[in-house]
Amino acid sequence: MDYFYGTSPPPEYERYASIVDAATLVQGFLWALNYGEASYRSIKDRTYGMAIFPLCCNYAWELVYTVIYSSQNKYERIIMTTWLILNSIMMGFTIKFAPNEWRHAPLVQRNIPFIFLAGVAAFVIAQLALAATVGPGLAMNWVAALCYLLLTIGSLCQLMTRGSSRGVSYTMWLSRFVGTYVGVICVYFRYNYWPQNFSWVDEPIMKCFSGISLAVEIVYGVTLWHIRKQERHHIVEKSK
């Protein structure tokens, strides 16, 4: 995303800017769908679908790069604001229903709001420190990749720990998966035609984050399919 202040896109990039903007809007819609579906599943199953630690990181990222810093791209500004609003709603439902998943750990169960407050505050401070160190443009994109890595790993661990599909769905998985990797279109054009600001895309750390996230997403989809298959089998067995 374009948080590189004081710079303008070169003419060779401008020819493809409309393609990047279109991909950005698709990405924005799919992640908005993810947040909406997560809120719906929270209400329906009285639980939460996004793991607590990654959710705090993701929410802090949206807070920092919507309220404190702002994208130079008008579409990204609209999308980030929309995400922050929807994520706030989702977090509210998460705080409300999270105690249902922590009956085995009363200390956690009684302190869910404080855990979220402390988690978000810590991630906000860390992200502001990183932005002050390397600049908001680089920090924003690095942390976006980190957030997604944490979300994928956290979601898979949570799914396997629960052994149940409560709080999640194929819609949540696919909107997260496709909504992230449609961003490859943006990355391709910005890296090739705006290298002054986006050469970091080719750094080993970004390749590492992207590769691990992709592998985990595929494993998540297979695991969700297997668990849903087991749940359908149990329903059939109970109906006999």
Curated annotation (Swiss-Prot):
Q: What is its main location?
A: membrane
Q: Where in the cell is it found?
A: Membrane
UniProt-listed InterPro entries = PaxB-like
What is the applied biotechnology use of this protein, as the UniProt note states?
A: Compounds in the chrodrimanin family such as chrodrimanin A or verruculide A exhibit strong inhibitory activities against protein tyrosine phosphatase 1B (PTP1B) and therefore, they could potentially be developed into drugs for the treatment of type 2 diabetes or obesity. Furthermore, chrodrimanin B, the end product of the pathway involving chrodrimanin A or verruculide A, does not exhibit the PTP1B inhibitory activity, while it functions as a potent blocker of insect GABA-gated chloride channels.
Q: Which Pfam families match?
A: Pyr4-TMTC
Q: In which pathway does it act?
A: Secondary metabolite biosynthesis; terpenoid biosynthesis
Question: What is the reaction catalyzed?
Answer: verruculide C epoxide = 3-hydroxypentacecilide A
Q: Which residues are glycosylated?
A: N197
What is a biological process (GO) this protein takes part in? terpenoid biosynthetic process
Q: Where are the transmembrane segments?
A: 16-36, 48-68, 78-98, 112-132, 134-154, 167-187, 205-225
Assigned EC number: 4.2.3.-
Q: Which GO terms describe its cellular component?
A: membrane
Q: Its topology with respect to the membrane?
A: Multi-pass membrane protein
List GO molecular-function terms, semicolon-separated: lyase activity
Ordered alphabetically, the record's keywords are: Glycoprotein, Lyase, Membrane, Transmembrane, Transmembrane helix
Record's function text: Terpene cyclase; part of the gene cluster that mediates the biosynthesis of chrodrimanin B, a meroterpenoid that acts as a potent blocker of insect GABA-gated chloride channels. The first step of the pathway is the biosynthesis of 6-hydroxymellein by the polyketide synthase cdmE. The prenyltransferase cdmH acts as a 6-hydroxymellein 5-farnesyltransferase and produces the hydrophobic metabolite verruculide C. The FAD-dependent monooxygenase cdmI further converts verruculide C into verruculide B.
Q: Name the protein family.
A: Belongs to the paxB family.
What is the name of the protein in this document?
A: Terpene cyclase cdmG
Give the organism the record lists: Talaromyces verruculosus (Penicillium verruculosum)
